Amino acid sequence: MTDLVKLTIAQSHKLLKDRKISSAELTKAHLERIEKLEPEIKAFMTVCPETALSQAEAADKAIKQGDIRPLTGIPMALKDVLCTKGIRTTCSSKMLENFVPPYNAHVVDKLAKEGAVLLGKTNMDEFAMGSSTENSAYFTTRNPWNTDKVPGGSSGGSAACVAASEAVFSLGSDTGGSIRQPASFCSVTGYKPSYGMVSRYGLVAFASSLDQIGPFTKDAMDCALVMNAIAGFDDRDSTSVPQTVPDFNSGLDGNIKGFKLGVPKEYFSQNMRPDITEKINDALGVLSGLGASIDREVSLPHTPYALAVYYILAPSEASANLSRYDGVKYGYSYNQTENMWEAMEKTRAKGFGSEVKRRIMIGTYALSAGYYDAWYVKAQKVRTLISQEFNNAFEKYDALITPTTPNLPFSIGEKLNDPFEMYMCDTCTIPINIAGLPAVSIPAGFVDGLPVGLQIIGKPFADQTIMRIAHAFQCATTWHKETPRL
């Protein structure tokens, strides 16, 4: 008998369309899986069984009437940074512990229109600030491949639930690697679209010039199906770009013969584990065998400055975005004083966790009088240089290939007390956000039983190209089909 929780979107869709299974059966199987595994994995902040079963019933009625789309009846999860009308949205923070949004995020409405089934909201680093999901105010999500290890972050819950077969797909957000890094750590396909490709309306903001919403899926084909559903212009988001939405499934034929791929030397730094480099070299061999040409002598010399640029710009934007949480209109409120200023001060002191407060302070400092020109303006100038280097590279290459992370999934607690060590986890992913590029992380093997991810980077709005490369790689390998023993 078919194990329903192991199905991809495409496989589930075919069975639903042929009426061999129902959405109710598929949804119940995933809810049972969640009930079984959640005590150990802890991927979900909120599970919505009644909502899920109601939506599954509606999907089955639509299918019976011949109204079926690629995501109709497919159980999915959302990172708890996306607003869901009537369903708690916490950002894994005490500040929003009991916040129930009065509206849906744009992507939530689009998925609802497609008939997808919402299983629940996933755990994350508080306000999307972190690389391990240990910064959640509630609990730490565990890596399905080894529950002593972190799943990555900040979208760790969204990655873990797909890896653990608790959901067919999920959505996360990526500000400096928060989709791709946990995708690498959990051995799933994680995609950050071009900046402006997917509306941020209803995404609780961390850093508005860097944030982007994207999917976690079991393979590149599924990723394309989700992108077809969520991409597109939205006039409610000032950063949404009025581009024609491509058919992301177009060209997914496994053929990348003649593609020119560059390998930037700077991404193989001294802190890169040699065994990860070995796996990436193996992956490059696969791509070469598929007919792509590989140039290993690409140089992006400003790459080493990306981490410093990010940790000036992102905290600066966070300082502004998070100033709205003062305990007055919504969210946590310290009310044990009659002094308004003390109430606001205590609200923020008690409502935010240590990492969020650290980044707010860094950002406030960088924006302050006397330091704005020295730090913030200079960082913006270097950001431009990083973007220009990518643009120059893409005049020669169809895509760039790098490791997703310089390290393997690490033990829970290992880096928690060393912010710099934690920040270094994102050295391969941060430059892509700075330049607003599309990038995908796909499974590329294992080292000591722990996953390794391959990152494919594309030029702005050439999202289809990297999807084609990812799909071709997965046609030639089986790493994405491996699942953890749970």
From Swiss-Prot:
GO terms for molecular function: ATP binding; glutaminyl-tRNA synthase (glutamine-hydrolyzing) activity. This is Glutamyl-tRNA(Gln) amidotransferase subunit A. Belongs to the amidase family. GatA subfamily. Gene3D superfamilies: Amidase signature (AS) domain (3.90.1300.10). Heterotrimer of A, B and C subunits. Its EC number is 6.3.5.7. The gene is gatA. GO terms for cellular component: glutamyl-tRNA(Gln) amidotransferase complex. It comes from Dehalococcoides mccartyi (strain CBDB1). Keywords: ATP-binding, Ligase, Nucleotide-binding, Protein biosynthesis. The keyword ATP-binding applies. Signal peptide: none annotated.
